Amino acid sequence: MNQGKIWTVVNPSVGLPLLLGSVTVIAILVHAAVLSHTTWFPAYWQGGLKKAA
């Protein structure tokens, strides 16, 4: 482990939830930004336009 000494400063029971929580928050923010600033992403989630028969 390259940065193994960090666990002598921060307890893993505190550090790991903070790390995973911050990654989750960043992922949600990126998805929200893409969803609100593009036109193709919401259409992709809706499955595109249905053609009339």
Curated annotation (Swiss-Prot):
InterPro entries: Antenna_a/b, Antenna_alpha, Antenna_alpha_CS, Light-harvesting_complex. Residues 1-14 are cytoplasmic. It is found in: Cell inner membrane. It comes from the Bacteria. One of its GO terms (molecular function) is electron transporter, transferring electrons within the cyclic electron transport pathway of photosynthesis activity. The chain crosses the membrane at residues 15-35. A bacteriochlorophyll binds at residue 31. It is a single-pass type II membrane protein. GO terms for cellular component: organelle inner membrane; plasma membrane; plasma membrane light-harvesting complex. Residues 36-53 are periplasmic. The core complex is formed by different alpha and beta chains, binding bacteriochlorophyll molecules, and arranged most probably in tetrameric structures disposed around the reaction center. The non-pigmented gamma chains may constitute additional components. Antenna complexes are light-harvesting systems, which transfer the excitation energy to the reaction centers. Belongs to the antenna complex alpha subunit family. This is Light-harvesting protein B-800/850 alpha chain. It comes from Rhodoblastus acidophilus (Rhodopseudomonas acidophila).
